[in-house]
């Protein structure tokens, strides 16, 4: 059986709000859509933190559990938990084999966490990962730049994912958006 991958996650801070969106498509290799309703964005730490994944589904669940454990260990300190996950992920021979990326956010901080040890906080409050990530990132940046007060973070996240779904064959229109205000 081929590698099963999930696709596009987008996150944004905008006008005091924040939102994360993900599509529902899970693809086997490059040929078969296995599921269209996967939930790749979740609430953690009593609903105060959002986390989303792109990559291998089983690997992502391992990372979700690890991140949630660190988040609890460090009493909700998002940056500390992300750094500790990245250190453990990069330093452990077995964990280094995991093929996934995480976006994590709370009301004030947005981070990308990868297995190569990166913990990246964007300058503009926008991140996107997965096969449609570049499309969602481009759409989201344009929307945020020109939306001003007319769009919420939730609306920007949903519109960015809709744009990615129109372009990327590995991203569908079954979009789940979670927001913190």
UniProtKB/Swiss-Prot annotation:
Active site as annotated: 7
GO cellular component term of the entry, any: proteasome core complex
UniProt record similarity statement: Belongs to the peptidase T1B family. HslV subfamily.
UniProt cross-references to Pfam families, sorted A to Z: Proteasome
Keyword annotations: Allosteric enzyme, Cytoplasm, Hydrolase, Metal-binding, Protease, Sodium, Threonine protease
InterPro entries (UniProt xref): ATP-dep_Prtase_HsIV_su (IPR022281), Ntn_hydrolases_N (IPR029055), Proteasome_sua/b (IPR001353), Proteasome_suB-type (IPR023333)
Role, per record: Protease subunit of a proteasome-like degradation complex believed to be a general protein degrading machinery.
Primary residence: cytoplasm
Superkingdom of origin: Bacteria
One GO MF term: metal ion binding
Regulation: Allosterically activated by HslU binding.
Name under which the protein is recorded: ATP-dependent protease subunit HslV
Places the protein is found: Cytoplasm
Gene that encodes the chain: hslV
């Amino acid at each position: 059986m081929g590698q099963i991958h999930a696709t596009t996650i987008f996150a944004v801070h905008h006008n005091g709000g924040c939102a994360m969106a993900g599509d529902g498509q899970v693809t086997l290799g490059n040929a078969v859509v296995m599921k269209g309703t996967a939930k790749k964005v979740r609430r953690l730490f009593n609903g105060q933190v959002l986390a989303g994944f792109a990559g291998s589904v089983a690997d992502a669940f391992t990372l979700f559990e690890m991140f949630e454990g660190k988040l609890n260990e460090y009493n909700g300190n998002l940056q500390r938990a992300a750094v500790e996950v990245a250190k453990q992920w990069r330093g452990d021979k077995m964990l280094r084999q995991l093929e996934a990326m995480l976006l994590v956010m709370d009301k004030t901080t947005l981070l990308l966490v990868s297995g190569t040890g990166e913990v990246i906080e964007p300058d503009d409050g926008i991140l996107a990962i997965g096969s449609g990530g570049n499309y969602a990132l481009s759409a989201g940046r344009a929307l945020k730049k020109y939306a001003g007060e007319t769009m919420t973070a939730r609306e920007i996240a949903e519109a960015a994912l809709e744009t990615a779904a129109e372009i990327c064959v590995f991203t569908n229109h079954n979009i789940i958006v979670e927001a913190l205000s």
